[in-house]
Amino acid sequence: MALSQAVTSRASVFKSKTWIDTGYRLHSRENKPFMVSSLLEEPSLVVLPPSMTTELILAKETDLSFWHALDDIVFSEHAFYSTRILSLPLQTTIIRRHLASGAQRFMPAVVRQLRNTLDREWGSGKPKQWRSVNLFNSLLNVVNNMVSVVFVGTDLANDQDFQTSITKHTEQVFLTMSVLRMEVESKLMPLIMERLKNSSELKAGQDKPDDLLQWLIDCQTSLKDPAERAIELEPSLIVTRVLMSYFVSVFLVNVALFNAVSIMGRLPEADYWSEIYTEARKILDVDEHGWTKEKVDKLWKTESFVKETMRFVGDACFEMRRKVMAPTGINLSDGTHLPFGTTVGLPSNAIHNDDRFYPQATSFDGLRFLKLRESDDGNTARGSLLTATSNTFLQFGHGRHGCPGRFLAADILKLILAEMTLRYEIKWDEKPEESSWFGNSLLPGQNTVVSVCPRD
């Protein structure tokens, strides 16, 4: 590598966002791809303009691979000890099959877990007093506990040793993964062995657990190829698939939640905390039977606020990654040749902050998508939904590889914000710590502290 390229690559760790934004202004607006150097993803990335989004998502997996690009980020063989979680992504198929339509089944258990965790993290009002909490860590514990109900059931969701281990694994998966995996396995492996035993002895008509772990076992048991079935039913591989599911779910949902609450601290004059409280209170006052999927769906203002946070802040400046796997490379519609092994993607943060797609894009408007939803245009209203992906909203991806868990994520985000505002007052002693760009990712300021107090 030439010295100039080495220096450029090193600088990309902290300047990638700036370079992509500059390239977007100079090239993407002219419908031209451009290249940025990257130390974290050798040797460089090709950034496509928004006009090529459809071309990207319609490309064959054998030409532009989603899974190979993902593996370059998560290093599945080293971080999770298996490449099968991506070459045969059963957990993705299962999440798409069960979670999109299963929210109502989980709602009572998820709400109970949310309230219990908030009692522990933010106080239960007995005695009623203000307390200081680390915002990022407390929200991470809340999200992790709620997701655990859906992934592994209530027993492990309430096991604090397991919750501590799985949270550490999610945060530090690339650092001390061997030790952390052992801690998780010590709790998860006995449950897997019990489930495998019970599944083999289960009689027709008998009830069985309804969570990700059981769905995995059922799917693996139904594989027709005996050799594949034997491999997939190895308990260690089941652990790996569960860990991967946590990794792609908990941290990203928590970042979105943290960004949403942090925006409230940066824009206190807008008083979004009270806005969300008022909406949630009105919905529950109509019917005191508690949260249902139908009621969560009515949190339009909260949903708009979360989606605007994702648009305005986001968590990455380069998304919709694909890796060129065609041996001879591929040619884009404008004639640009991409050699084998090239990583391409879209400048998501720049697109989300483009006035052509979002009027006054550089200003935060928590009601932006509520206004669109209340418009007379049916297509515009549907596009305002948090779970709606498009060429101009890429937070959950787009096309056939759009995030399959986004429906559960949306419900969790809305539910947490509603419950927090209903149950607590919040004070910002100082503005939230600024997040920082590292490579193509936005890292939350994890030292932000807020004061919270249970409402009367």
From Swiss-Prot:
GO molecular function list: heme binding; iron ion binding; monooxygenase activity; oxidoreductase activity, acting on paired donors, with incorporation or reduction of molecular oxygen
Compartments (UniProt record): Membrane
GO cellular component term of the entry, any: membrane
Gene3D superfamilies found in the cross-reference section: Cytochrome P450
Residues bound to heme: 403
Cofactor: heme
Bilayer topology term: Single-pass membrane protein
Residue stretches in coiled coil: none
UniProt pathway: Secondary metabolite biosynthesis
GO biological process: secondary metabolic process
Keywords from the UniProt entry: Heme, Iron, Membrane, Metal-binding, Monooxygenase, Oxidoreductase, Transmembrane, Transmembrane helix
EC class name: oxidoreductase
EC number, UniProt record: 1.-.-.-
Spans traversing the lipid bilayer: 243-263
One Pfam entry name: p450
Family indicated by similarity: Belongs to the cytochrome P450 family.
Function: Cytochrome P450 monooxygenase; part of the cluster that mediates the biosynthesis of a highly modified cyclo-arginine-tryptophan dipeptide (cRW). The first step of the pathway is perfornmed by the arginine-containing cyclodipeptide synthase (RCPDS) avaA that acts as the scaffold-generating enzyme and is responsible for formation of the cyclo-Arg-Trp (cRW) diketopiperazine. AvaB then acts as a multifunctional flavoenzyme that is responsible for generating the cyclo-Arg-formylkynurenine DKP, which can be deformylated by avaC.
PANTHER family with a match to the protein in the record: CYTOCHROME P450 (PTHR46206), P450, PUTATIVE (EUROFUNG)-RELATED (PTHR46206:SF1)
Protein name according to UniProt: Cytochrome P450 monooxygenase avaH
